[in-house]
Curated annotation (Swiss-Prot):
This is ATP synthase subunit a. Its main location: membrane. It comes from Nocardioides sp. (strain ATCC BAA-499 / JS614). GO terms for cellular component: plasma membrane; proton-transporting ATP synthase complex. F-type ATPases have 2 components, CF(1) - the catalytic core - and CF(0) - the membrane proton channel. CF(1) has five subunits: alpha(3), beta(3), gamma(1), delta(1), epsilon(1). CF(0) has three main subunits: a(1), b(2) and c(9-12). The alpha and beta chains form an alternating ring which encloses part of the gamma chain. CF(1) is attached to CF(0) by a central stalk formed by the gamma and epsilon chains, while a peripheral stalk is formed by the delta and b chains. CDD domains: ATP-synt_Fo_a_6 (cd00310). It comes from the Bacteria. It is a multi-pass membrane protein. PANTHER family: ATP SYNTHASE SUBUNIT A. One of its GO terms (molecular function) is proton-transporting ATP synthase activity, rotational mechanism. It holds the Pfam family ATP-synt_A. It is found in: Cell membrane.
């Protein structure tokens, strides 16, 4: 949903209609497609704007980093310098420092994941797009499942299935009957719950931030255009809050991409760590 397309026009005397989850249910491009409900979410059988944004993000990132790496030189160009700086940031702070000596083979995934999430988050602040892709929960669950497969596969590859299951479910240094209580809890926490919390954290922040932006923008417009002049200062304040939240949202877009990849690195580190 863009701000231009989501301006709430209410019938005269009906009052202001605040934005809500329904504003994130975008129709299929071209219209005329069926929808169905699952897990409290509306799903469209067709191509939607967030789907196109995923493709656009992949194309933009490929073109940028291909151009940055195409003519590598000892004295880097500005584009190469920026590309290497981006790569070094993920490699060192999210790969080497978190995973340790086995980090190198996971850097391509962490690097791609970080900038893919960051750009899709940033779409919420880019004019004429103005919709963070991961404010739709289904998009985030796809990334979470991919991450779950990768760090579990890494652990099984190193320790074997039984050894990895023991590593994830049996706390080190604990013996006796209490294990009957701890093992199911560890299994739930480390195997089942992680992808859910990983997805919900990113989704909730992108959803809530965008909802606040819409609320301040449309609320301010309604106060200034539909209410008496004595409420004008409130409308102006709402728009000032919109500007402030917009800048805060840019910071959150970066932080949520960083946190998502940081947790991925931590999960991988735990999966490939030596046994207790």
């Amino acid at each position: 949903m863009t701000f231009a397309a989501s301006v709430v026009r209410t019938a005269e005397g009906d009052g202001f209609t605040p934005p809500g989850p329904h504003d994130f249910d975008l129709p299929a491009i071209g219209g005329g497609h069926d929808t169905f409900e699952m897990f409290g979410q509306s799903f469209v059988l067709g191509v939607t704007k967030p789907m196109l944004q995923l493709v656009l993000a992949a194309i933009v990132l490929f073109v940028f980093f291909f151009a940055a790496a195409r003519k590598r030189a000892m004295v880097p160009s500005r584009l190469q310098f920026v590309g290497e700086g981006f790569y070094g940031f993920v490699r060192n702070s999210l790969g080497r420092d978190i995973i340790g000596h086995d980090f190198a083979k996971f850097v391509p995934y962490l690097f791609t994941l970080f900038f893919f999430i960051l750009l899709n988050n940033a779409f919420g602040s880019i004019p004429f797009i103005e919709f963070p892709t991961f404010s739709r929960s289904g998009m985030v669950y796809g990334l979470a499942v991919l991450s779950w497969v990768i760090y579990n596969a890494a652990g099984i590859s190193k320790h074997g299935f039984v050894g990895y299951l023991k590593l994830q479910t049996v706390p080190g240094g604990i013996r006796g009957p209490i294990l009957a209580l701890l093992i199911p809890l560890e299994f739930m926490s480390n195997i089942l719950v992680r992808p859910v919390t990983l997805a919900l954290r990113l989704f909730a922040n992108m959803f809530a931030g965008h909802l606040l932006l819409i609320l301040f923008a449309l609320g301010g417009e309604y106060i200034l255009t539909e209410m008496s002049v004595q409420y004008a200062p409130v409308g102006i304040l709402a728009w000032l809050m919109f500007v402030a939240v917009a800048f805060l949202e840019m910071l959150i877009q970066f932080l949520q991409a960083y946190v998502f990849v940081l947790l991925n690195a931590m999960y991988i580190s735990g999966a490939v760590a030596d046994e207790h």
